[in-house]
């Protein structure tokens, strides 16, 4: 069995999604979210729909030294007050169940945020656990909202310029089939 060594030793290789990775990403995402009580099981479909719409600004994979795909993260454009800009949404992020809580997701997130900075992105938003995402600098702000969701879970990270204000909307792929 191929595994990623524990934190502190060899890290996964993070690189852009390659042609032909879509099926593996879909299978990985389905497996990663299957045991999650908050999941509606739609995450793989969202990634496929973003890819088909040309809306995957960044699609990164984590690979073991042997080349096994064990993680994926997607970033796509978001709109603030229905205006396009340089803000992006993080997610979904998926890690093979046997490798969760071993730093693969953190490596994907950190690399993805660095790549957004390279693209001169203004910021990034997500809907997720504030206790987890705080380590990457994500914060909640009542001036930035998402479809009436609890503000505690809708978070942002400013990469340049002032914080965004208004109501954020993700790509329509997140709205369902």
Give the predicted meaning of each segment.
Residues 78-90, 100:
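A conserved beta-turn-beta hairpin within the catalytic core of GNAT-like acetyltransferases
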């Amino acid at each position: 069995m191929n595994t990623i060594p524990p934190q502190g030793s060899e890290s996964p290789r993070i690189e852009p999604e390659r042609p032909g990775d879509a099926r593996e990403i879909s299978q990985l995402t389905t497996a990663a979210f299957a045991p999650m009580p908050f999941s509606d099981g739609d995450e793989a479909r969202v990634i496929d729909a973003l890819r088909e719409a040309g809306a995957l600004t960044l699609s990164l994979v984590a690979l073991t030294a042997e080349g096994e795909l064990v993680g994926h993260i997607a970033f796509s454009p978001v709109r603030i007050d229905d205006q396009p800009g340089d803000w992006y949404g993080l997610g979904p992020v998926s890690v093979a169940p046997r490798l969760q809580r071993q730093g693969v997701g953190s490596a994907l997130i950190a690399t993805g945020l660095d790549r957004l900075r390279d693209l001169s992105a203004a910021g990034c938003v997500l809907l997720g656990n504030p206790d987890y995402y705080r380590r990457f600098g994500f914060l909640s702000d009542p001036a930035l909202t998402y479809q009436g969701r609890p503000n505690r879970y809708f978070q942002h990270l400013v990469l340049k310029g002032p914080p965004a204000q208004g109501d954020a909307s993700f790509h329509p792929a997140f709205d369902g089939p």
